[in-house]
C-alpha cells in the first residue's frame, strides 16, 4: 500500500448526473481551479455514449480548454468499452483510463450491456491498449460492498476478481461503494484482506450520507488506505441509492480528518476555497 495520501478529485462523478447541461466553458473553468489545488489526480470526464450520459458528451472539448502548465495533477477519464478507451488514449494529456468493472452480474448488464466475463475480456483489450499507448489503467470494482439486486456478494467474490485482474497485470484498483451501503466493519475487513497484495495500489471510492461520511473515512484510513476518491461538498454519487442524501465523500471532510491525523497535505487551500465558492455556479 502507498504510504502517502493521494486524493483523486471527481468533478466528473459530481456533474454527470445533473440533468441540465453544464456549458463546456463552465466545466473547464471549474476543473482548471481544481487543477491548481494540488490533488494527485482529477477525474475530469468520460468517453462514453452521449445517449448514456449526455452531460459528458463534451469531454474532449473540455480537455482542450484545460490548463495543465502549472499543475502537478494527473488526468483520469472514465471509459465503458474499448471504443471509448481508444478515444481517450488519443489524448496525451490523459494519464489514467478508468474502467468500472462490476462484480454484480445484474449491474454489469445494466451499466454496460454485457456480463462480467465479457467485461473481463474488455479489460484485457483495454489493458493491452494502455500498454501500447503508455496509459495507466485504473479499475473500479463496482458494487464492491454488495448490490441491491440479490446477486451473490462476499469478500471472497471481490478478491477472486481482484486476483484475476492482478494476474492480468492491473496494478491500480479502487473498491467502489456504488450505492453507499458499506459499513465501517466491511471497509476494515476488506482493507485487511488487501494488505496481502504486494505492489498493488488499492484505493477507496466510497459513497455516504453526511452522517456516515467520517466513520467510513476512519475505517478506510485505519485499515491503511491512502488512496481516496472524493468530490467537493459531496456532490454527485448514487442515483440508485435509496437515500437521496447519499453522495460522494466530501473532499473537505476527508481533508479535515487527515489534518487531525497530522498527515502532511501539499494543497493550496486558497485555491481549494476558490473552487468551493465557484462550485455553486454549477451545482447551485
Tell me what each language-model feature is:
Residues 1-284:
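Catalytic cores and adjacent flexible loops of soluble metabolic enzymes
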Amino acid at each position: 500500500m502507498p504510504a502517502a495520501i493521494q486524493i483523486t478529485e471527481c468533478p466528473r462523478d459530481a456533474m454527470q448526473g445533473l440533468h441540465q447541461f453544464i456549458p463546456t466553458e463552465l466545466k473547464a473553468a471549474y476543473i482548471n481551479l481544481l487543477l491548481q489545488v494540488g490533488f494527485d489526480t482529477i477525474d475530469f470526464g468520460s468517453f462514453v455514449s452521449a445517449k448514456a450520459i449526455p452531460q459528458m458528451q463534451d469531454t474532449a472539448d473540455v480537455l482542450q480548454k484545460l490548463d495543465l502548465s502549472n499543475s502537478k495533477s494527473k488526468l483520469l477519464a472514465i471509459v465503458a468499452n474499448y471504443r471509448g478507451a481508444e478515444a481517450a488514449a488519443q489524448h496525451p494529456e490523459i494519464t489514467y483510463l478508468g474502467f468500472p468493472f462490476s462484480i454484480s452480474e445484474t449491474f454489469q448488464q445494466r451499466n454496460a450491456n454485457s456480463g462480467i466475463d465479457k467485461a473481463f475480456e474488455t479489460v484485457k483489450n483495454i489493458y493491452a491498449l494502455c500498454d501500447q499507448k503508455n496509459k495507466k489503467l485504473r479499475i473500479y470494482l463496482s458494487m464492491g460492498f454488495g448490490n441491491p439486486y440479490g446477486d451473490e456478494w462476499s469478500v471472497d467474490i471481490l478478491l477472486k476478481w481482484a486476483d484475476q485482474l492482478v494476474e492480468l497485470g492491473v496494478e491500480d484498483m479502487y473498491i467502489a461503494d456504488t450505492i453507499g451501503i458499506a459499513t465501517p466493519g466491511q471497509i476494515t475487513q476488506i482493507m485487511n484482506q488487501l494488505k496481502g497484495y504486494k505492489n498493488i495500489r488499492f484505493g477507496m471510492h466510497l459513497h455516504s450520507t453526511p452522517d456516515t461520511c467520517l466513520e467510513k473515512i476512519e475505517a478506510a484510513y485505519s485499515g491503511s488506505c491512502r488512496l481516496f476518491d472524493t468530490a467537493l461538498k459531496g456532490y454527485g454519487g448514487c442515483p440508485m441509492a435509496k437515500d437521496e442524501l447519499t453522495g460522494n465523500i466530501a473532499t473537505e471532510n476527508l481533508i479535515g480528518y487527515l489534518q487531525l491525523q497530522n498527515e502532511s497535505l501539499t494543497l493550496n487551500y486558497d485555491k481549494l476555497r476558490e473552487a468551493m465558492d465557484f462550485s455553486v455556479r454549477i451545482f447551485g
